[in-house]
Amino acid sequence: MRERLFSLISKYGLRANSDLGQNFLIVDDIIERNVERAELSGRDVVLEIGPGLGVLTDALSKRAGKVYAIEKDPRLVEILRKEYNWSNVEIIEGDALKVDFPEFNKIVSNLPYQISSPITFRFLGYGFERAVLIYQLEFAQRMVARPGDRNYSRLSLMVQAKSYVELVERIGRGAFYPRPKVDSAVIVLEPKPKSEVIELNEDLVRALFQHRRSTVAAALKKSHHMLGLSKAEFKNVKDVISSAPYAEKRVFQLSPEEVKEIEAYLKVNNII
């Protein structure tokens, strides 16, 4: 796989586009482990974001029934279509944050790091069975952080409200070409059953985590405009907010269940 990638780079005189976050994974063992982690069979339809020069795509094509690979760089799209003769791979040229996703049940990707947050939230809006994703290490650590941890954030809360998430492998920067400035990590995501999913008001979550080190009451007061409250309206409900569940708890200590309780209280009191 590694030899194939460098052969294509040499053949086409390619330089990675840093604006598109292009860092090609060059360690065969990591590629193989991620394909194994996806638990693929012939019935699976895989979505890959940023196939690059097709090294992971090729491995996926041998295990899955169908692979959809979304690539933004027209140079790479042309190379993929010219160099590979896949019968079960469809290359889609476009921006993964904007194009319509085809139907799929699994995701396997070495993600462009600059779209990590928006693409992850987009994934969470789809019903998939399993995702194996490479992220920047710091981002991956935030995804798995628990309430009270230093890295716990809005991302941690929203991901864990809807899915089981596990950091399964740390990857050094030498595993990529060109070499990035940061280490990476492999995350495995599995959506929770509907009965366990906690649907949260996103405006409330943003308002709270805008001031993650503050208490719940203080955060809501500072961010009342994010809840659609005018200054006059806020004055009328200030005392109600002070009596919210977990009012004196720090925002970064809140579990999804506790945020749901706060949401229910604010709804009952017609604040959101």
From Swiss-Prot:
Taxonomically, which superkingdom? Answer: Archaea
Name any one Pfam family assigned in the record: RrnaAD
- Which residues hold S-adenosyl-L-methionine? 23, 25, 50, 71, 95, 110
Compartment annotation: Cytoplasm
| UniProtKB keywords | Cytoplasm, Methyltransferase, RNA-binding, rRNA processing, S-adenosyl-L-methionine, Transferase
Q: What is its main location?
A: cytoplasm
Q: Does the keyword Disulfide bond apply?
A: no
Task: Please state what class of enzyme this protein is.
Answer: transferase
| Gene Ontology molecular function | RNA binding; rRNA (adenine-N6,N6-)-dimethyltransferase activity
PANTHER family from the xrefs? Answer: DIMETHYLADENOSINE TRANSFERASE (PTHR11727), DIMETHYLADENOSINE TRANSFERASE-RELATED (PTHR11727:SF7)
Instruction: Cite the HAMAP family for this sequence.
Output: 16SrRNA_methyltr_A
Tell me its family. Belongs to the class I-like SAM-binding methyltransferase superfamily. rRNA adenine N(6)-methyltransferase family. RsmA subfamily.
Name of the protein in its database record = Probable ribosomal RNA small subunit methyltransferase A
Q: Which organism is it from?
A: Thermococcus onnurineus (strain NA1)
Q: Which gene encodes it?
A: rsmA
